[in-house]
Amino acid sequence: MERELWPPLYHTLLEVAKDFQQRYVSYQPWVLAAVFLWAALHDRPVSWACQRRHWSTTKLRPARLPHRTTVGRRIDGLAVGAFLREVERRLRDRRQVSLLALLDGKPLLVSGVSKDRDAKRGRAAGGMGKGYKLHTLWANRALPESWEVTPLNEAETTVARRLLPQAPGAGYVLADGNYDASPVFDAAAASGRQLVTPMPEPNAGKGHHYQSPHRKRCIDLLRGDFGRSLYERRRQIERLYGNAVSFGGGLSAPPPWVRGLERVRTWVWAKLLINAVRILRKQGLTS
């Protein structure tokens, strides 16, 4: 996938770099981002990408490559983060936001005997695991409207309340039953969207504790054909995550050289950007 994905990604880095300069540094943020993305695209450590011989398959590369310690020291910092955020925004804005958003989480597991202090034990597909989780809110664009990486044990409802206010527009948010909590319904409504999750039957909404009016609205929706057909579209989430891991350089469990919350977050960021270029290229929107 290198020949297809690297040129549009590299040109986007250069485009953003025209408006983004950091003073008093030997290597601009775009150079560090390029090295990290090249490593992520090939599922290699940064030390590999800092060696010029490993760029022999492309002419699209920085004139000078930094030492691996320079990348390691700065890649998780504010300057590179601000640069990547602008790259993310420009790629995302090549498509219009949808009225239908999809909220979910993807476990990013590490070895059960890993000494990574930030990796925590929590629920994963098929049982318990150790690692992190990527929480996303997608609205039919190449990148999530908002996303966050947390230790695996952090509650999805807690993270959802942080993600929802960051999503522009109005419409519906589809999610699984893990998000069935009144505070999440209220957070979605405050951002202009109606959350739709499956409901326990037959007494949903009849408890004596606080019931969000937006949760009751969800119950009413799911009793009708429109609500049921609307929720069926949640299957798009599985396709989003499935496609994100189905190509070389795609999103998968963090490799052994990626440990610690900050580094895992930056690694996921790189994978999301790579996947975004893949999506846009498929849709003819990479120019």
State what each model feature region is.
Residues 19-25, 59-60, 258-259:
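A short glycine/serine-rich beta->alpha loop
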Residues 178, 182-249:
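Helix-centered, glycine/charged polyanion-binding patches within enzymatic domains
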Residues 1-22:
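Basic, low-complexity segments
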Residues 65, 102, 174, 236-237:
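Alpha-helical architecture
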Residues 20-34, 38-41, 51, 73-76, ...:
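Polybasic low-complexity intrinsically disordered regions
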Residues 227-287:
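Basic, amphipathic alpha-helical segments enriched in Lys/Arg and hydrophobic/aromatic residues
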Residues 60-78:
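Major-groove recognition helix of helix-turn-helix-like DNA-binding domains
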Residues 46-61:
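DNA-recognition alpha helix
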